[in-house]
Regions:
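Donor-nucleotide binding loops and adjacent catalytic segments primarily
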Residues: 45, 50, 54, 177-184, ...
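C-terminal alpha-helical cap of glycosyltransferases
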Residues: 352-368
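Glycosyltransferases and closely related glycan-assembly transferases
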Residues: 87-101, 108-123, 136-144
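Conserved nucleotide-sugar phosphate-binding/catalytic loop shared by glycosyltransferases and other
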Residues: 4-12, 30-80, 85, 231-233, ...
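A short, well-ordered alpha-helix in the C-terminal region of glycosyltransferases
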Residues: 338-352
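Active-site-proximal region of nucleotide-activated glycan assembly enzymes
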Residues: 46, 57, 116-180, 188
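Structural loop-to-beta junction motif characteristic of Rossmann-like glycosyltransferase folds
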Residues: 56, 120-121, 266-267, 284-292, ...
Length: 368
């Protein structure tokens, strides 16, 4: 028991927090197969399904964020924070972690606060170019802060920062099939130019609208499309497409093999979440970024501009997307020189082995 490595990993809410968390856990297990890893997430959020599916145990806290529009609702939020703090104490008392990792998201607040108060060393991993509220609050208590962008000393003590990049999904990096094989896998012409549209794990209304408003261009472009609508929008979209002949358009609510989808793509259209951007950098994939306006501190636009300012991506404003996005994508995918330039520049920004580097830091903290 005493020699077992016991690590808590906390946070979640979106795929952008969960994928790095699972990657870090996998890297720790690869280095220390004896490690016991416990996740702590927020009840009702995506991590409660995704983490067990990845093979790890998770405990849920009844926590949520503050409602900035309906202030009276925050009385209930304060109670949930208090209750989550008490539950976190019980979880930590029973599990006895030797180190804690926070990846952002509501649950990491009470979990790492309790760990720090008990002298358990903490590491936080900030995926974005603009630090999240939870991580900013935890920074004083963390011993190490792993980041993916330059200039993060604006938010965190410089002596704690380690530039690691963001851990990404291994299946995205390890796909060995050719682009032609990948297109065949999706039932498409192996030789035709292909655009992949993804709106994050929840879907993106404006990206979806950009296709629905320009179906004539889809039909006439000579380009084929793999379109992840998101579960929330899928039924309505399928109803709108009913009866139309669209063999060049493969529509799905969720792409399970994203590695194959990216391999099939000559160009990707995506939100500007930090994890997605890290994947595009590592695989060298030309991308048009449409940052979500519905995120804290407009951090997705800041993520996108870090690439756009280095000619490593194309930016389309969310409000403009329904009108201009699809034409810009079709024009770009037919411009070989532009694709080659985007590919070359985005590759320069990729930081490899991020999960391994972070796992090493966690193990050091746990065993010092």
């Amino acid at each position: 028991m005493n020699n077992e490595l016991r690590i808590i990993i906390s946070g979640g809410g979106t795929g952008g927090h969960i994928f790095p968390a699972v990657s870090i856990a996998n890297a720790i297990k690869a280095k220390r197969p004896d490690a016991k890893i416990l996740f702590v997430g927020a009840l009702g959020r995506m991590e409660m399904q995704r983490v067990p599916a990845a093979g790890y145990e998770i405990k849920g806290l009844p926590i949520c964020g503050f409602d900035r529009k309906h202030l009276l609702k925050n009385i209930a939020v304060l109670f949930k924070i208090w209750k989550s703090q008490h539950m976190a104490k019980s979880i930590i008392k029973n599990f006895k972690p030797m180190a804690a990792v926070g990846v952002g998201g509501y649950a990491s607040g009470p979990t790492l606060n309790v760990c720090a108060s008990k002298g358990i060393p903490c590491l936080i991993q900030e995926q974005n170019s603009y630090a999240g509220v939870t991580n900013k609050l935890l920074a004083k208590k963390a011993e190490k802060i792993c980041v993916a962008y330059e200039g993060m000393e604006r938010f965190f003590p410089a002596d704690k920062i380690i530039m690691t990049g963001n851990p990404v999904r291994q299946n995205v990096l390890e796909t060995t099939i050719t682009p032609e094989e990948a297109r065949k896998q999706f039932g498409l012409d192996p030789e035709k130019k292909t655009i992949v549209l993804v709106g994050g794990s929840l879907g993106a209304r404006t990206i979806n609208e950009s296709v629905l408003q320009h179906l004539d261009l889809v039909k006439e472009s000579g380009v084929q499309f793999i379109w992840q609508t998101g579960k929330y929008y899928n039924a309505a979209i399928m109803e709108q497409l009913k009866g139309q002949e669209l063999p060049m358009l493969k529509v799905t609510d969720f792409i399970s093999d994203m590695g194959a989808a990216y391999k099939a793509a000559d160009l990707v259209i995506s939100r500007a979440g930090a994890s997605s951007i890290s994947e595009f950098c590592l695989i060298g994939k030309p991308v048009i970024l449409v940052p979500s306006p519905n995120v804290a501190e407009d951090h997705q636009t800041k993520n996108a501009m870090a690439l756009v300012n280095k000619d490593a991506a194309i930016y389309v404003k969310d409000a403009d997307a329904p009108e201009v996005l699809l034409k810009k994508a079709v024009d770009t995918v037919k411009d070989e020189a532009k694709l080659a330039s985007l590919c070359e520049n985005i590759k320069k920004l990729g930081l490899k082995n991020s999960a391994d580097v972070i796992a090493d830091e966690v193990i050091k903290l746990a065993t010092k």
